[in-house]
A protein has these predicted regions:
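Short amphipathic alpha-helix that is part of the acyltransferase structural core
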Residues: 2-55, 163-206
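Acyl-donor-binding surface of acyltransferase catalytic domains
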Residues: 3-14, 101-183
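Conserved beta-hairpin
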Residues: 45, 53-85, 215-232
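A short, internal acetyl-CoA/4′-phosphopantetheine-binding micro-motif in the GNAT/acyltransferase core
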Residues: 98-108, 248-258
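Conserved acetyl-CoA-binding loop-helix of GNAT-fold acetyltransferases
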Residues: 109-120, 252, 258-275, 293-298
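Conserved active-site alpha-helix within GNAT-family acetyltransferase domains
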Residues: 137-152, 287-305
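Conserved catalytic-core motifs of GNAT/GCN5-like acyltransferases
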Residues: 151-162, 302-316
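A conserved beta-strand-loop-helix scaffold within acyl/acetyltransferase catalytic domains
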Residues: 196-250, 254
Length: 316
């Protein structure tokens, strides 16, 4: 089977697994084309010797060879599955195996077979779990630990909702340069320090990354009565071939938390995005970031899928 043929089969299966409400946002032909492109590259990577050599050098594990860092296509219950080794935070001691693509439904038989194969094929890494994306939840009979929640909503539907009210009047001021980066970085560090459970899931962008976000034109300082209380920023990012946006940064400083500002701030950003270019506002939020998930739901960005870790060696 050629890479293109396998990628097409994976793409059609992935499209079929999408929830109906998500499919309604999308042009099916465009989505299928985008999935084919991404999956053709993923399928070809399993023969990319240069990539696996770089991967090995970046995450060295005693006793491992370059081939151990290679993705593999396997057959489980008559279905093709593409598995790939990963390391959380590029830490060689935190290995997991990613289900990159598969044919057919996301059912217990497929995941059990993948878990058995992953444990054997990559035993040198001692992987902790198999990771997969499900729409919207894991099949019954499989033990799963939550990771990231996939949240999304269209700007059109969000802007048609009644806007959430803020307890205090807020103003959003467009950012045009990086002069406020240090203030933002300090506030972000205070947030990280105050939420140790999220420490491994949060990354403060450097100034160069911040500058690139600002260039897209939708970065805003948030002020209350002239006092800076936070920042919110979005960048354009297609959603399965549809026009879309990702909220790249969203932060309220300590003094502004608990003041019912988060949802109005996010709604204000989305109204500006909609006026610029209607589309899907999407992204991922860690399941422990309860406040951010609540804000997303208040605005109209619902959980449509989940990244799950399926523990290896469990009774699942």
């Amino acid at each position: 089977m050629t890479d293109a043929h396998l990628a097409d089969r994976f793409a059609r299966a992935a499209l079929a697994r999408l929830p109906a409400e998500v499919s309604d946002w999308l042009d099916q032909d465009v989505v299928l084309d985008e999935l084919r492109k991404a999956l053709t590259a993923a399928v070809a990577k399993r023969r990319d010797d240069a990539f696996v050599a770089r991967f090995h050098a970046r995450c060295p594990v005693a006793g491992a060879s370059d081939d151990d860092y290679r993705s593999v296509e396997v057959t489980i219950d008559g279905r093709a599955v593409l598995l790939e080794p990963r390391f959380k935070g590029l830490d060689p001691g935190k290995s997991f195996i990613e289900v990159v693509a598969h044919e057919g439904p996301a059912d217990a038989a497929l995941f059990r077979g993948a878990m058995d194969l992953a444990s054997e094929r990559w035993s040198v890494f001692k992987p902790r779990a198999l990771r997969t994306v499900v729409w919207p939840s894991a099949p019954e009979g499989i033990a799963a630990n939550p990771d990231l929640e996939v949240v999304a909503g269209t700007t059109t539907a969000i802007c048609e909702r009644v806007a959430p009210e803020a307890a205090r009047n807020l103003e959003m001021v467009r950012i045009t340069d990086t002069s406020g980066f240090e203030r933002f970085a300090r506030a972000y560090q205070r947030f990280v320090d105050g939420h140790p459970v999220l420490r491994d899931e949060l990354w403060i962008p450097d100034e160069a990354t911040f500058a690139k976000v600002v260039e897209h034109g939708h970065s805003y300082d948030v002020e209350v009565e002239g006092t800076w209380v936070g920042l919110i920023a979005a960048v354009p990012a297609p959603f399965m071939g549809a026009r879309g946006w990702i909220i790249h940064e969203e932060l309220l400083d300590e003094s502004a938390r608990g003041c019912r500002l988060a949802a109005p701030m996010q709604r204000g950003l989305i109204e500006r995005l909609h006026a610029d270019r209607a589309g899907v506002v999407h992204g991922t939020i860690h399941h422990l970031n309860v406040a951010s998930l609540a804000t997303a739901r208040r605005v109209g960005r619902d959980v449509i899928g989940r990244h799950l870790f399926l523990p290896l060696g469990s009774d699942a």
